[in-house]
Amino acid sequence: YFGKLCKERGISVTFLLGARTASDLLELDEFRKYGETFVTTEDGSMGEKGYVTNHSILSKYHFNQISTCGPKPMMVSVAKYAQANNIRCEASLENLMACGLGACLCCVEKTSKGNLCVCTEGPVFDVNKLLW
């Protein structure tokens, strides 16, 4: 959805996808429809071997914005990269959401504004406001 929306609005998007192995990558052709797509796998079975935060593309391009989603440890690394390079970065959090109303407090995330419910006040947050 993100890529499609950006393309419809004339916004250029570069995707950097990461996974443990090539078989874990999903919808690669879908990403390629909407922007230049680079891949990294931990085992080197597709694209560059390693993590998204170590991909060579990061030294070749200047990015004005990063949007990240996935496992929290990876998003923390991406956020640190963005902060070190003064790049605006948003993370789409995937916390467990039980009620979807904020009543159960199951999805609470610590932020500079206090504890916020991901289901009602997210799921997208500026990484500079997240207290990881």
Language-model segments: which ranges?
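FNR/FR-type flavoprotein reductase catalytic core
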Residues: 1-91
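Local cysteine-cluster metal-coordination motifs and their immediate loop/turn environment
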Residues: 1, 72-73, 94-123
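Short gly/pro/ser/thr-enriched loop/turn and capping motifs at secondary-structure boundaries
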Residues: 22-24, 45-46, 96-100, 125
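Short microdomains enriched in Cys/His and/or Lys/Arg
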Residues: 121-132
